[in-house]
Amino acid sequence: MGVDLSDINDSLFKLSDKLSNDLAKQRNLCIVKEPSFSIEEHIKCFTTCINTYKPFSCLKHANWALLLAKKKSDTGLIGYCQSLRGLAYYLLEQYQSSAICFGFALKHLKKEDLTKWQVQLDSMLTIVHEQQNQDTSSLIPDECPNIPELEAAKIEGDEEFLNMSLKAPEGQIEKNEEKLSNRIRYDWSQTSFSLNIDIYAKKVKDEDVSLLMEKNTLKIEIKLEDGSIFSLVLDPLYEEIVPEKSSFKLFSSKVEITLIKKVSEIKWEALVKSPANNSVNVYAKDSNHSSASGNTKNKAKDWDSLAKLADLEEDEPTGEAALANLFQNLYKNADDDTRRAMMKSYTESNGTALSTNWKDVKSKTFETKPPQGMEPKKF
């Protein structure tokens, strides 16, 4: 599919009359003085727009870069541009379109390019596939957009660029704040004696958290970076907790709440007894015990078996205790001759030798032979 690069430049400069001087300076971050754009220049513009969070402009430059890559028939570059489209759609919260573009990217990448990008692409595909249920977009992108669609999208994108650059109306600010709150997700897991809830909110300070824990209730409010409030109310809890022993910790990427069960060994099937009582300001819980707006798979994890295994491992002796335990087990299950051999060799050598063969031991005297680098001392 061919493209007249002069049309691209003309369309860009037709919009200059709509921009104020300040906006024109911002816009110049994504244009060049030459009469046409190259693929590299579109990719640079994409990077600039993504750093300033302008997803419509990101999609515009990714689409034009893809057309130029198609013209060159460079499959590796085509795959890379498709991944840029996928990222742009992801920023626009059009997750189904994003997944399709990442699929195009995987199809076009060469083997060596695929190896380099596989982890990132697989990671993004996992995220967007899990968010497809939240996708309200009716747009399903073609593998390569046509010129009229690009022109229309480009103008719409630039108008969006203007709207994002200018001060948003008061109602739009409230809408954006609500959308940021919608991105907060949480999940939970449990052991036989505790229940852990992770709320994935970044850079939360202690003074930004309001927490109430009672035996049947958990209420938490978190002030987010943009000033909006995320709240979670669990009432009544599935089982009673011990508030005075429960706690929370702040990390750079999450708030971690640890609830101590009043009755251990009871497996919680949910956080609350009735889903109708689970009040969250931005989402409801699903059957997988994860937030409906979550970005990753979150299932309630039953750590009971792992916790018991960990307890067993902690109880297992190590070092000298392990050696003494081995000696006791051998001695307990041995016959009389073996026991005599063990006692004679162990005591005569001051614990540096152990033999179970009485025929060899009965006429032998054992010397103290400490490990290399150590010396025996008399007391």
Swiss-Prot record:
Region (Disordered): 345-379
Domain of life: Eukaryota
GO CC field: cytoplasm; cytosol; nucleus
MF (Gene Ontology): protein-folding chaperone binding
Gene3D superfamilies: 2.60.40.790
Domain CS as annotated: residue spans: 181-272
Ranges where the SGS domain occurs: 292-379
Record's function text: Involved in cyclic AMP (cAMP) pathway, possibly by participating in the assembly or the conformational activation of specific multiprotein complexes.
Name of the protein: Glucose-insensitive transcription protein 7
Organism of derivation: Schizosaccharomyces pombe (strain 972 / ATCC 24843)
